[in-house]
Amino acid sequence: MPQLSGGGGGGDPELCATDEMIPFKDEGDPQKEKIFAEISHPEEEGDLADIKSSLVNESEIIPASNGHEVVGQTQSSQEPYHDKAREHPDDGKHPDGGLYNKGPSYSSYSGYIMMPNMNSDPYMSNGSLSPPIPRTSNKVPVVQPSHAVHPLTPLITYSDEHFSPGSHPSHIPSEVNPKQGMSRHPPAPEMPTFYPLSPGGVGQITPPLGWQGQPVYPITGGFRQAYPSSLSGDTSMSRFSHHMIPGPPGPHTTGIPHPAIVTPQVKQEHPHTDSDLMHVKPEHEQRKEQEPKRPHIKKPLNAFMLYMKEMRANVVAECTLKESAAINQILGRRWHALSREEQAKYYELARKERQLHMQLYPGWSARDNYGKKKKRKREKLQESTSGTGPRMTAAYI
């Protein structure tokens, strides 16, 4: 920062005070030169504002004029196909308050969903379908219209091909829908990329583009029946491509057999399982047959049992009771009423009975009779849960 050598206000009048800044111009920079020229000439600001407004007006007029010119050219070549559309000029108004009617209406391009000019619609955001491309210079922002993009590019079609002006198929007549205000083509085999929509199939196809914040109107009411009712389902389904509609059920398309084919296999499995069970039962019986059969050996009678066996008939004859519990109670009372000598007789008979039993069944034990039922239950449970029944029986034997 250059400073005065003498300090104060003396010296050359071109020099300024020490607390002021001197702007130095960078030579060779055209942008900075223009900025300094504007600072030095403020009277030119009004001219720049006029230039900006004229450029903006031209950018708004050019797309509209181009759109009307293209519409005029296409209407001249397609007048014989739109007599029906001219009869209903006011039917195309949408009940949404004119949201879709802002800007020019392209009624000559039939078969498509018409959308407004996105460049002049104030309701569309800057990030919508085809916003204008702003170009900025050094100072003045210039809005350049998209000349490379056709003004009818916001049109939405169901075709993969790009739309070009003048490519309307003139050999296909168009039909005008009085409710929706848009024209459409009947489905024809000459148009492989356009898919006809039947009233039953429209609800199953999702729209390719969803507008946020705008009401959605059903399309099913606008399509008329182009074919008889007996042939509408078959013809409309046959015109869809093979990748949109699944084929008939069968092993050649999905690899999964038909349910009518699966059920016989299940039915064939039931006899197989039954035969397995029938095959298991003989093995269980054979294993039991292989085991040595032990007959049920009754234990020898004691003194009281011998007394009951002898006196039971007398008690039944004396009393009219037929209940065994009541008879046993009577016999028990009489047994305790006997003297020692009378009871000793039955004790001697019981001793002889035990000796005879030991001679007939040597090595017999009363545990064999009492533990046999529990043993059988345990074997059945082990065989049902796991196949360890034979090993357990071998261990117990």
Curated annotation (Swiss-Prot):
Taxonomic source organism: Rattus norvegicus
Chief place of localization: nucleus
Keyword flag Protein biosynthesis: no
InterPro entries per UniProt: Catenin-bd_sf, CTNNB1-bd_N, HMG_box_dom, HMG_box_dom_sf, TCF/LEF
MF terms in GO: armadillo repeat domain binding; beta-catenin binding; C2H2 zinc finger domain binding; chromatin binding; cis-regulatory region sequence-specific DNA binding; DNA binding; DNA binding, bending; DNA-binding transcription activator activity, RNA polymerase II-specific
A Pfam family annotated for this UniProt entry: HMG_box
GO CC term (a single one): protein-DNA complex
Localization of this protein: Nucleus
Descriptive protein name: Lymphoid enhancer-binding factor 1
Free-text domain note: Proline-rich and acidic regions are implicated in the activation functions of RNA polymerase II transcription factors.
SUPFAM superfamilies membership: HMG-box
Keyword Kinase in annotation: no
CDD domains: HMG-box_TCF7-like
Family: Belongs to the TCF/LEF family.
Assembly notes: Binds the armadillo repeat of CTNNB1 and forms a stable complex. Interacts with TLE1, PIASG, ALYREF/THOC4, EP300, MDFI and MDFIC. Interacts with DAZAP2.
Region (Disordered) location: 38-102, 164-190, 266-296, 367-397
